[in-house]
Amino acid sequence: MINLKIEENVKESQNVNTLYFNWDQDIRPGQFAMIWIPGYGEIPMSFSGLGRRKSITVKAYGSASRKLTELKAGDDLFLRGPYGNGFDVREGRKLLVGGGSGIVSLYPIADQETDALISAKTRDELIFKDRFPESRRFIATDDGSDGFHGFAHELLQRINIDSYEAIYVCGPEQMMYKVLQVLKGRKVFVQFSLERTMKCGIGICDSCSLGGKQVCKEGPVFNIEELIGNPEFGVYRTTYSGRRIRLNVK
């Protein structure tokens, strides 16, 4: 377990905060760490910023993540990792497709040749929108409060997909499943970063299993070819207790 110090806590939206800290560790875009919150347990978090000054961006959706968002400069941050394979970052034009907080793990890929499709339920839940110039971003909201009125996969169909060398996707699994349907069969290189229930992060507990693949060890990044035909992707998710729940994907 590594003990670091929080340098800064920046509020991104009503329930999302970015925590900055110094850590001299090489990390690939798309890798993650297991963050330990004393008294609350561990949760997996992707890195939203690399370099010597690193960051994680946290959405408060449960007691552990909510406690993380409350950390202040000087507070302890406990983690282990980094884990996972990370993205295969290609040269040339790239498109990031982030749903909800999914743009967080994609952001370290961004360079001067990168566009971003960012989607959320409503304007107030958009994250990192202002980190991309208007000419390089596509915005979609479910309620139409900002940008395109609709879902990420619907807006993606209006974009010239073939103009990109690579497309990287992260978000809720239902959203990614629909994006996969739009992208399969295209010649562009595509990778998805999956978000699944994780307890150990090192391939022991098997709670993150996806059709025989361990997301924490073999992922969390998968090429589109690995997900096409996977019997669980977009079909089931597993709760922390191990219960399988069918996803509502139409």
Swiss-Prot record:
A single GO BP: 'de novo' UMP biosynthetic process
Cofactor comment text: Binds 1 [2Fe-2S] cluster per subunit.
Pathway, per record: Pyrimidine metabolism; UMP biosynthesis via de novo pathway; orotate from (S)-dihydroorotate (NAD(+) route): step 1/1
Obligatory cofactor(s): [2Fe-2S] cluster; FAD
PROSITE patterns for the chain: FAD_FR
Domain of life, per lineage: Archaea
GO MF annotations, alphabetized: 2 iron, 2 sulfur cluster binding; electron transfer activity; flavin adenine dinucleotide binding; metal ion binding; oxidoreductase activity
Annotated FAD-binding FR-type domain residues: 1-89
Gene3D superfamilies, per database record: Dihydroorotate dehydrogenase, electron transfer subunit, Nucleotide-binding domain of ferredoxin-NADP reductase (FNR) module, Translation factors
Keywords: 2Fe-2S, Electron transport, FAD, Flavoprotein, Iron, Iron-sulfur, Metal-binding, Pyrimidine biosynthesis, Transport
Binding-site positions, [2Fe-2S] cluster: C200, C205, C208, C216
InterPro entries attached to this UniProt entry: Cyt_c3_hydrogenase_gsu (IPR012165), Dihydroorotate_DH_ele_sf (IPR037117), Dihydroorotate_DH_Fe-S-bd (IPR019480), Dihydroorotate_DHASE_ETsu (IPR023455), FAD-bd_FR_type (IPR017927), FNR_nucleotide-bd (IPR039261), PyrK_electron_transfer (IPR050353), Riboflavin_synthase-like_b-brl (IPR017938)
Function: Responsible for channeling the electrons from the oxidation of dihydroorotate from the FMN redox center in the PyrD type B subunit to the ultimate electron acceptor NAD(+).
Membership in a protein family: Belongs to the PyrK family.
Alphabetized PANTHER family for the sequence: DIHYDROOROTATE DEHYDROGENASE B (NAD(+)), ELECTRON TRANSFER SUBUNIT (PTHR43513), DIHYDROOROTATE DEHYDROGENASE B (NAD(+)), ELECTRON TRANSFER SUBUNIT-RELATED (PTHR43513:SF3)
Record note on quaternary structure: Heterotetramer of 2 PyrK and 2 PyrD type B subunits.
Name by which UniProt lists this protein: Probable dihydroorotate dehydrogenase B (NAD(+)), electron transfer subunit
Taxonomic lineage: Archaea, Methanobacteriati, Thermoplasmatota, Thermoplasmata, Thermoplasmatales
Gene, per the UniProt record: pyrK
